[in-house]
Amino acid sequence: MGQKGCPIGFRTAVTKKWRSLWYGNNQEFGKFLIEDVKIREFLKKKPSCQGAAGFVVKRMSGKIEVTIHTARPGLVIGKKGAEVESLKAELKKLTGKDVWVEIAEVKRPELNAQLVADGIAKQIERRVSFRRAMKKALQSVMDAGALGVKVQVSGRLAGAEIARSEWYKNGRVPLHTLRADIDYATASAETTYGIIGIKVWINLSEKKAVPAANHAGAASTAAA
């Protein structure tokens, strides 16, 4: 039943780091968590963040620091930093707090599950054959040095009247092995026949557990 759980949540604080780093008491926790969700949803809709692989939110003394992991940092920064300043202003208006935006470049987008899933979704929306898009993604991921990759698409594939799921796998993708560094992401493609769901698992390597000093603790950190 390993396929029923989220590989990221399963490994958080073991081999994966938290995506939200802050402390909140009983009164603040829910408020901070909802605020994190709003920040992420806002950034996902911004054209400059379309190539973003993920967002990390940190809080310290009334301020918020958002790190945007992207394969296209120039698009997020904008001309002379104009886009970053615009994001800061809009996030401040959204949260009512000072927001600092950091940009982290994704060096190898072929090994990032979110970027691979988004790439497949865009191809399906452009009416590329879903099988062709999946096989191309598998090949590029394996060529980049992954130990294994699995891609699954679900929905009215090729306009079929009955929805179904199809998946392709290459290499080794263990689901119960905690030391396996599994990157996982989902995406959706909006087609004339309906929504096509995409899931991607990438086995990057085997790694040691995250040091205890880096653990934020379940009570003090939320993984939104």
Curated annotation (Swiss-Prot):
Transmembrane segments: none annotated. The keyword Ribosomal protein applies. CDD domains: KH-II_30S_S3. GO terms for biological process: translation. Pfam families: KH_2, Ribosomal_S3_C. GO terms for molecular function: mRNA binding; rRNA binding; structural constituent of ribosome. The keyword Nuclease does not apply. InterPro entries: KH_dom, KH_dom-like_a/b, KH_dom_type_2, KH_sf_prok-type, Ribosomal_S3_C_sf, Ribosomal_uS3_bac-typ, Ribosomal_uS3_C, Ribosomal_uS3_CS. GO terms for cellular component: cytosolic small ribosomal subunit. It comes from the Bacteria. Residues 39-107 form the KH type-2 domain. Keywords: Ribonucleoprotein, Ribosomal protein, RNA-binding, rRNA-binding. Part of the 30S ribosomal subunit. Forms a tight complex with proteins S10 and S14. Belongs to the universal ribosomal protein uS3 family. Binds the lower part of the 30S subunit head. Binds mRNA in the 70S ribosome, positioning it for translation. This is Small ribosomal subunit protein uS3. It comes from Chlamydia trachomatis serovar A (strain ATCC VR-571B / DSM 19440 / HAR-13). The lineage of its organism: Bacteria, Pseudomonadati, Chlamydiota, Chlamydiia, Chlamydiales. The gene is rpsC.
